[in-house]
Amino acid sequence: MFLLAVGVMCLTACTQKKGGERGPRMGGGMSVNKDSDSTFVALKNETLKKFRQFTFEDAKTGKTMAYNLLVPEGYDGTKSYPLVLFMADASTVGKDVTAPLTQGYGALEFASDRDQKEHPSFVLVPQYTEWAVQDDWSTTDEVEMTIRLLEKVCKEYNVDTNRLYTTGQSMGGMMSFYFNITHPDLFAASLFVSSQWDTSKMQDFGKKHFFYIVAGGDQKASGGMRDLAKVLKENDARVDSASWSAKLPASEQEKLAEELIARGGNINFIKWEAGSVLPESGKGMEHMASFDYGYKIAAVRDWLFRQSKK
């Protein structure tokens, strides 16, 4: 038993990256139990029933992809609706199709009564069978399958293709960056949370509309933010940025976000002060702990829905 325990500890230590991130597939395999978060439990109870589960048969690869889809209540085929594509982190891969919904606030905030009343929209949440992207910028078939799934949904329903939004945390955020490079004209705006990508391919990102939110103590994601800021500056792009504690009252965070948005730029950075995303005990990894904070700010979500390609 002792040798087994030592082996497990060695395996865990060897898969930890600098800054507390787990392996090349950020957040890989781990998940956080949020049953003690009464606000999250209430949101989950309010929103899960709004999603239906389907399977996409991809003709190009012959593979299948399970996914969750929220169709706006009272959907009217004569009207067009925006769509949010949410992709979770690698802690959900290979699990039940609903795992990307139940892992945290991300998809559920867009499905909330509040958001659906303000912004009736489709919410598309794929489930992945494996880590879809790697830190060497390589991708699996499931990445482009996601785009073909999105195209399928847009054909089946009256989706406003001028108001498609991509967002994700960690692995999902990396995919969102990738889509902005490989499908530069597809999305009206993006929300990148706790993630990064190859900035050598981002010279034209100054023309895009996005929020980029990371934790100061998440070395990989905050490093990605720093590198992107440098590329944007080199290409004469404007970046509006702010930093505050994730422990501030929600009302104060909303006010700070609104002040950032009021500057009127198309690129907005938020960096949580180092350590502020962690629980009071100070234990945990800032990377995993930062995901939910990126989605709780209503002002950011409202800004996203105001963006349009027209």
PLM-predicted stretches and their roles:
Residues C14-L83, T167-M174, L228-K230, D240-E252, ...:
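A domain-start/cap signature at the N-terminus of enzymes
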Residues G27, G216-S222, R238-K310:
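C-terminal catalytic histidine-bearing segment of alpha/beta-hydrolase fold enzymes
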Residues F2-C10:
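Bacterial N-terminal signal peptides
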Residues L83, M87-I147:
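Active-site machinery of serine-nucleophile hydrolases
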Residues E151-E156, N162-G206:
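Primarily recognizes the serine-hydrolase "nucleophile elbow" in alpha/beta-hydrolase
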Residues L101-R114, V193-Q203, Q253-L256:
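Alpha-helical scaffolding within the catalytic cores
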Residues F211-V214:
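Short beta-strand/loop motif that positions the catalytic acidic residue
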Residues G74-K79, A132-S170:
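Gly/Ser-rich "nucleophile elbow"/oxyanion-hole loop immediately N-terminal to the catalytic nucleophile
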